[in-house]
Amino acid sequence: MKKYFALLLTSILLVTSCTSCVSTAPESEDAPQPSSTPVTSQTKENDTVTLSVYLEAVYTDDEVHFPIYEKLKAFEDSHPEIHLEFVSPVSGASDPAARETEINQLNTEIITGGGPDVFLMQTLRFTDDNLFPDVQKAMQNHSFLNLSDYADANAFDPSSCYSGVLAAGQLEGQQYILPLSFSVPLFVGAENVITGSGYQPEIASANQTAFFEELSRVLNENGKQVEYSLSLTNLLDQPLIDYQEGAIQLDTDAVRQALTIEKDYTTHQLNFFNNYDSQQIDALAAGTPFGLLEMSDIALGTLHPLDTKGIAPFIQGIPNENGGITAEISSYAMASANTQYPEQCAELLYYLMSAECQDAAAYPSTTEELPVRRDSMKASLESAHQFLVYDASKEKLSEDDIAFREETYGGNLQDTTVQSLQAICDQITSAHFHTIWYSALELGQSETGDDVLTSSLNDYLYGDTSLDELIDTLTPRLQMYLDE
């Protein structure tokens, strides 16, 4: 998992050297000022509603032109009756203490009936101080507006989206959270290398165990290794925490098998691959490594240069325990149950689900994600690649810069590659928001000061903790957390 964050940091560097200072919009003159954020929606003028929108500061830099920020401003321009006021805490990387203070302040406001009206969130966390660290528990506690009540008024058609992804934001059949983008687990490599090795994708597609058994067979027979960067327990059909049933599901055959495989592959396979290194791409084309096991947001960094070099890619979705595909939600949006303006909040959120926004990859993310709207796949990938490679601020780049980026990062994906991704996404049966293991659940700290769940998993993967000890230790702690 450490290599996953390293690769993500590489992707973020493509975007910009964004400042991470506080970007909280000024409050209304009539608003009380005990904190740096709007308490609730304030009326700007008699006919204007002000919605406070939580969005991390990195996305609100006017000079970078993130698609999500551009579309939010476009919404505001086309809706003169709605004014958006951004609530953007300081980055934890630049000032951890200040971020902790601001997040605590926001939590206090939310608990007391205030806080932002709208939340635009990314799943990936770079800090332990986050709003709604466990968004599913917050949904169970009815912290968010029931958006199903406003779907028809906003002409939202759920059938236009991947149902397995949408379901992650539902409670008792009602939509409280709108997933905006997601990622799927992929096995990627050079087609001629993998097909020529004797690897049988039909056998591997049966379920997660069958996939790794078939892959291990081929690796052993050919003396090869793969790059492994996954969290398998988050790619199961079954959740580790069943919020609706109030049950912890660590001690199941599927979880035990996934953790056993993860320990094997984490300690015996490669843990880093530079997707943007031309020499490593050429080595991958020659079979060293044999392939990459990555989430699609990282794997796309390899697929672009492979396509550009004319190297036919091999792409297979890594199945869950039941043979389907489990997605990871990358970004999502919701409105506060406390908002005074539910209709306006819903209109904004459903706008982000429209073809206009999904085609533009308008979601809070610093990597290439897949859109929830089915028909937006090709357009969104082209939009995201355009932004990530060119920084959307073309005036900042010289011709030499552009030539270098095009050579290094590749061009748009071939239609056949996009179609392969679409076919994999059509197999999605479930989706989860965040792995429990990293900066997600608040179970306290270990003796070394690390997150308890992260530390416990690492002790199992790299230390002497047995699988039984891991499960027996964490199950009661997680159950206590769930029951709080």
Region annotations inferred by a language model:
Residues 4-24:
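Sec-dependent N-terminal signal peptides of Gram-positive bacterial secreted proteins and lipoproteins
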Residues 88, 305-394:
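Extracytoplasmic/periplasmic substrate-recognition and gating elements
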Residues 121-184, 311-319:
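Hinge/lid segment of periplasmic solute-binding proteins
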Residues 145-160, 204, 240-258, 317-323, ...:
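Short, solvent-exposed loop/beta-turn-alpha elements that line the ligand-binding surface or hinge
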Residues 167-189, 207-260, 286-293:
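Extracytoplasmic/periplasmic solute-binding protein
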Residues 215, 219, 245-278, 303-318:
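Glycine-centered hinge/linker elements that transmit conformational signals in sensory
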